[in-house]
């Protein structure tokens, strides 16, 4: 399933997430929400894999899917920061077993702006996970996002501070 950042609020029962787009602050916010939800679901250990360490990805997943006595609920956080979407990640995601493993949660954070329409890996993700687009917000979406960020303010001060921030920082999160 695909959603835009502004429509994302709760990961619900998903365990696999693909986060795309170029707005780093939005991606960071989404990752924090997802990690909190997964931790409350019993996923306590997190392994981060950068673009340079993709060889480890399959080994870590296999070790946790193999039915080991000591397997844990693991969050596998894969970070793709630049360039085309790596073939190693595509091949990894083409294996549907990763989406069905009860003790692996998957967060793929990617710099790609748009997800491809076809390909086994994207079809697997669309069917079994949640694809969250964190691209640049429109003006109205920025206002909604800012209102959520300022929810600690009293209702009477929100319009004053909110409009001032929007005027000074329009189109610049």
Model-derived features with residue positions:
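Non-catalytic interfacial helical region
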Residues: 2-17, 22-173
């Amino acid at each position: 399933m695909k959603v835009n950042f502004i429509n994302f609020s709760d990961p619900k029962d998903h365990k696999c997430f693909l986060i795309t787009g170029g707005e780093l602050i939005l991606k960071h916010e989404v990752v924090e929400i997802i990690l909190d939800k997964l931790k409350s679901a019993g996923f306590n250990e997190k392994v981060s894999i950068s673009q340079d360490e993709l060889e480890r990805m399959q080994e870590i997943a296999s070790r946790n899917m193999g039915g080991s006595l000591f397997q844990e609920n693991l969050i596998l956080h894969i970070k793709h920061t630049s360039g085309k979407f790596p073939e190693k990640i595509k091949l990894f995601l083409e294996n549907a077993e990763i989406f069905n493993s009860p003790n692996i949660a998957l967060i793929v954070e990617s710099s790609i702006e748009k997800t491809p329409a076809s390909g086994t890996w994207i079809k697997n993700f669309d069917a079994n996970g949640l694809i969250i687009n964190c691209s640049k917000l429109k003006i109205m979406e920025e206002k909604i996002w800012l209102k959520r960020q300022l929810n600690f303010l009293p209702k009477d001060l929100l319009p004053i501070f909110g409009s001032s921030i929007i005027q000074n920082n329009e189109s610049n999160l």
